[in-house]
Amino acid sequence: MTGKDGAVLSESLNKSKSLCATENGGNNNPHLSKSSITHPPKCTGFGIQEILGLNKEPSSAPRSTLDSFPAGAHLLASRSMLGPAGVGVGVGMGLIGPGGIPSFYSQPAFLEVLSDAQNVHLQPLSRTVGPLEHNQSASSDSDDVSSSERKMSKSSLSQSKKRKKRRHRTIFTSYQLEELEKAFNEAHYPDVYAREMLAMKTELPEDRIQVWFQNRRAKWRKREKCWGRSSVMAEYGLYGAMVRHSIPLPVQDGFPTTSCFSKHEYPPFFAESILKSAKDGIMDSCAPWLLGMHKKSLETAGHQSNEKSDVTQTPTNPKPDEAEAEERRTESPMSKEELRENSIAALRAKAQEHSAKVLGTVSSERLEHNMETTATEEKSSEQIDAKEEEKSS
């Protein structure tokens, strides 16, 4: 602030000094008034209460009121104390002398003075400083808006870069779905070759086919869970396979039965139901691997029947000792503990026999090895003797 504003403030400060001198009772000693104004009371400690002046004792010298100073003086003094430049702002500009700043601004209890300053009217200073502050606030607001717009633009650009482009959902044709369903009925986990063949048939990328199979497997598992929690049976058992492919269940005594199903035993009426469903035209709903399971079961049943027939044709005559032991076991009822002890003894005897056999085989192998080594040594010694005789002759 320079020019007329500075002259007005200096005149107001001079008037305030003259008023202070008259209030002091016409004291001709100016040093006492300056010392009473400029020297603030010393702070006793560095605590929060001491800094804020909460525990401060009332000073002996009367504190000068705000009414004795003009509006511009205490405003500049408060700005110089609270601003980042400190006290030197007002002093360096020449508006306020080094002794012109009153003592209550430098005291720790400046909060009370600032609260009292709300009742003071600052009309003459607001008229002169108002346009400048308005321009400064407008410029600062515009700078803030521009900086915020720049930050928003940068953040939007970074977010647009980070966001991945969303892929459009593929729409399968009926032909593609038919081919995929056929492949899924043949194998739930197709290999690379099968996926390549499907890609050539359906003209779809291989990654899309892989994703379709993943989704189809998830859908199939969900269905199996809803159908009586038969996911395990649907994977390995016959009951789940029949439920999955809508094959009629076998009927006994007028009611469908499921007690005869297991992983390795296939009832005869299961084959009949499969063949009936195939003849009636439900072949499309029946998976080909189901018929493969039926064929394998028939083959295994044929092998087992052949083995049983061979065993019956060449019966082995049991030894008389074993027959007598069996008769004794059947005649004499034994408790569970006796049976357990006998079984443990039999196991121990078998273990001893096995260990003896192993030791016998090991000992025989050692003897054979020793015999071979002695034979090779004898042959080598004979060859050496023959060579020495030839040399001597």
UniProtKB/Swiss-Prot annotation:
Pfam families with a match to the protein in the record: Homeodomain, OAR
DNA-binding region of this protein: 165-224
Motif (Nuclear localization signal): 150-154
Disruption-associated phenotype: Morpholino knockdown causes a decrease in eye size and an increase in expression of vsx1 and ccnd1 at 24 hours post-fertilization.
Any GO molecular function: DNA-binding transcription factor activity, RNA polymerase II-specific
Compartment(s): Nucleus
Residues spanned by motif Octapeptide motif: 46-53
An example Gene Ontology CC term for this record: nucleus
Recorded coiled-coil stretches: none
Record domain CVC: where: 225-299
Residue stretches of biased makeup (Basic and acidic residues): 319-341, 365-393
Main subcellular location: nucleus
Domain of life: Eukaryota
Compositionally biased residues, Polar residues: 18-38
Keyword Transcription: yes
Sequence motif OAR, location on chain: 342-355
Keywords: Activator, Developmental protein, DNA-binding, Homeobox, Nucleus, Repressor, Sensory transduction, Transcription, Transcription regulation, Vision
Keyword Cell membrane (UniProt): no
Entry's family note: Belongs to the paired homeobox family.
Biological function: Acts as a transcriptional regulator. Mediates the differentiation of V2a interneurons. Plays a role in eye development and organization of the neuroretina.
Protein name listed in UniProt: Visual system homeobox 2
Organism: Danio rerio (Zebrafish)
